[in-house]
Regions:
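N-terminal trafficking/processing presequences and adjacent post-cleavage segments
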Residues: 1-24
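A broadly tuned "polar low-complexity/structure-edge" signature
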Residues: 2-3, 43, 87
Length: 124
């Protein structure tokens, strides 16, 4: 998997919201109903890229969060982005996580997340 640690232009909250909405437009509405319950106003954090010496920190956007668990969906142009900019992560963990936690689309990240199970639990 290709990685990007080169400087990228800074993004705004509005740009990230727009990226999220463009991804949602591509997803079947039966899936987006659940996804939308977890979306938040994108929040910028800095997370450590632990596979370099010295360890470097890069911007990561939290775009969705669990209401019950330490779990979130992420977006970043760094690390495994831009090819796989949508990630699964723990809200309390400040690293990028492994390559298998990053996806080419928001849909794939959401489908592989525990958020789907949490949404199903909420409906019961």
């Amino acid at each position: 998997m290709k990685i990007n640690l080169d400087p990228m232009p800074d993004r705004t909250t509005e740009e990230i919201q727009s990226l999220v909405e463009k991804q949602i437009e591509k997803i079947d509405t039966s899936i987006t109903a659940g996804l939308r319950t977890f979306l938040i106003q994108p929040r910028l954090e800095t997370r450590d890229w632990g596979w370099s010496e010295p360890i470097r920190a890069f911007p990561v956007w939290i775009i969705a969060e669990s209401k019950r668990y330490d779990y979130c969906l992420l977006y970043s142009d760094y690390g495994f982005g831009p090819a796989n900019p949508w990630g699964l992560g723990f809200s309390s963990y400040k690293g990028f996580d492994a390559d298998y936690c990053w996806y080419g689309s928001l849909e794939d990240a959401y489908k592989d997340s525990r958020l789907i199970e949490e949404y199903d639990e909420q409906k019961k």
